[in-house]
Amino acid sequence: MAFNVTILSIFPEMFPGFLNYSLAGKALEKKIWNLEVINIRSFAKDKHSTVDDVPYGGGAGMVMRSDVVGDAVDSMLSVHKNTKFIYMTPSGTKFNQNIARELLEFPHITILCGRFEGIDQRIIDAYTPYELSIGDYILSGGEPAAMVVLDACIRLLPGVVNNTDSITEESFNYGGGVLEYPQYTRPEQWKGYKVPEVLLSGNHKKISDWRQKQSHVITKKRRPELLSGEINDKFT
């Protein structure tokens, strides 16, 4: 069964963007995943296709209108009644590999991409989307964040990555969720740097032990919370 995605955006022309290339692009051609993009501006109430307005209470920036966004959401829900509805926002749960895997369990997902200062809170109150963030920084809109989420999901779909070991041995999958070990390829020596001898030994047990140790060392140094389990890694 294909992975089906609907995007709600005021810039539909941004999609599929970089998802039209490499693994994701080939998977889109093969219909391993399907993309539908809905233009929120199509639901605007005036001839200028206005989707935003000044915030009540004052403040900087503009806010996406609840009536316009709500009509776009209602239109989507009339077709995709069982979709998993997601809103990309910096204040959401931080996205990770486990969430990417769990998203694939849904037959259809919808991602709402915000702009300006975000969407009217009443959209969140009325539709209770799952609020998702890709990190502690601000983008100009939710579209790039949505593409990041989709890229992480798509490469996990059967038939996208030919060598499944590439997935099971990478960061956040390898060794119970730690960072990946260092990788080396030809030439054997470069600018005085040599490939570790153990990787040239042909001893698979020693190579495996070395990789596990390196993963643990790197994770402890850069992301110790992954070892302590102090992260929210569930899609709830």
From Swiss-Prot:
Coiled-coil intervals: none
Q: Does the keyword Ligase apply?
A: no
List the InterPro entries: Alpha/beta_knot_MTases, tRNA_m1G_MeTrfase_C_sf, tRNA_m1G_MeTrfase_TrmD, tRNA_m1G_MTases_N, tRNA_MeTrfase_TRMD/TRM10
Q: List, in alphabetical order, the Gene Ontology terms for molecular function in this entry.
A: tRNA (guanine(37)-N1)-methyltransferase activity
> What's a GO biological-process term for it?
tRNA N1-guanine methylation
What the entry lists under Pfam families is as follows: tRNA_m1G_MT
tRNA processing as UniProt keyword: yes
Give the EC number(s) listed in the UniProt record.
Answer: 2.1.1.228
GO CC terms, sorted: cytosol
Q: Which compartment or compartments is the protein found in?
A: Cytoplasm
- Per UniProt, S-adenosyl-L-methionine binds at G114, I134, G135, D136, Y137, I138, L139
Q: Which UniProt keywords apply?
A: Cytoplasm, Methyltransferase, S-adenosyl-L-methionine, Transferase, tRNA processing
Q: Which reaction does it catalyse?
A: guanosine(37) in tRNA + S-adenosyl-L-methionine = N(1)-methylguanosine(37) in tRNA + S-adenosyl-L-homocysteine + H(+)
The record's listing under NCBIfam families reads:
PRK00026.1, trmD
Which family is this protein grouped under?
Answer: Belongs to the RNA methyltransferase TrmD family.
Entry function? Specifically methylates guanosine-37 in various tRNAs.
Q: Which HAMAP family does this one have?
A: TrmD (MF_00605)
Spell out the subunit comment.
Answer: Homodimer.
Recorded protein name is tRNA (guanine-N(1)-)-methyltransferase
State which gene encodes it: trmD
